[in-house]
Regions:
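Sec-dependent bacterial lipoprotein signal peptides
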Residues: 1-17
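N-terminal leader/targeting segments and the immediate start of mature chains
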Residues: 17-67, 242-245
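One face of beta-strands
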Residues: 49-57, 67-73, 79-85, 94-96, ...
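Beta-strand elements of well-folded, non-transmembrane domains
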Residues: 59-61, 75-77, 87-89, 208-212, ...
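Solvent-exposed loop/turn segments connecting transmembrane beta-strands
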Residues: 62-66, 86-93, 163, 183-184, ...
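An acidic-aromatic
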Residues: 80-131
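C-terminal low-complexity, charged extensions that often adopt amphipathic alpha-helices
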Residues: 124-127, 132-152
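Gly/Pro-enriched, hydrophobic low-complexity segments
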Residues: 147-245
């Protein structure tokens, strides 16, 4: 019995020592280097288990034409990204779902569908991007990629710069913009108007620039943001639909 008591005391003592050794992030003091800034950003931007977004999406083509439609996005952390795009009067144009393994897509206008490996996203956008990247960008909490960064403070923001990554961070430690450069292709995302709950942005602009391909420029303006509520992510392919090539 005495040995058991001593054992429990040792566990409690060891646990308290571990707890004391954890350095809490001090948000009251401005960061002095890249390591301190990254620590604040990652601690300040924790993803919700569920996220529901509603708004309008605009796709800008290189020919300067613009297509604007309604959009609803539902994200279950590390599981699924579901999206429905609608024309005026709420008529669904297409529905898509991304998992860590696959892309599911239904086109209502021509009654077609496809199911492809998630790696096809990189081919569609002509840049290296994975499920986790898309999830973090949509949830407005992208992680700063491990690298050696130069640190700079401007009037209201901070900048982290490396050879292939650039981040602009607000004084509330939210990422305002990120740039990833690989093989001459730039993937750029920008957030603006942090007006919603949890300091969530009103607008996301996503741009892929390539010297040899057409630009992919997409802007989403959110009108409604819901955190932490379980959402339906139904995806049923009608039997009459034909598989697209």
């Amino acid at each position: 019995m005495t040995r058991l008591v001593l054992y429990l005391i040792c566990i409690v003592f060891a646990s308290s020592c571990v707890t004391k050794s954890i350095n809490k992030v001090n948000f009251s003091l401005p960061p002095q280097n890249s390591k301190e800034l990254i620590s604040r950003v990652n601690s300040n931007n924790q993803p919700s288990q569920w996220l529901a977004l509603k708004g309008t999406v605009s796709l800008f083509l290189k020919s300067d034409s613009e297509v604007s439609l309604g959009i609803s996005i539902r994200v279950k952390k590390d599981s699924i990204i579901w999206a429905s795009v609608t024309a005026p009067f709420g008529i669904e144009v297409f529905r898509a779902a991304l998992t860590k393994d696959s892309i599911y897509y239904i086109n209502r206008t021509n009654r077609t569908y496809f199911i492809k490996p998630i790696s096809n996203i990189s081919k569609i956008l002509n840049t290296d991007i994975a499920f986790n990247d898309i999830q973090q960008i949509l949830a407005a909490n992208p992680k700063i990629v491990k690298n050696k960064y130069s640190f700079k403070r401007t009037n209201d923001n901070f900048m982290l710069t490396a050879s292939d990554y650039i981040y602009t961070v607000s004084n509330s430690f939210r990422i305002i913009s990120g740039v990833q450069i690989e093989k001459g292709i730039s993937l750029i995302y920008t957030y603006s108007n942090f007006i919603f709950e949890n300091n969530f942005p009103e607008q996301l602009e996503f741009l892929v620039k390539s010297p040899s391909q057409n630009e992919f420029n997409l802007t989403i303006n959110y009108s409604k943001v819901v955190f932490g509520q379980e959402q339906k992510t139904s995806f049923k392919i009608p039997k009459s639909y034909v598989e697209a090539e």
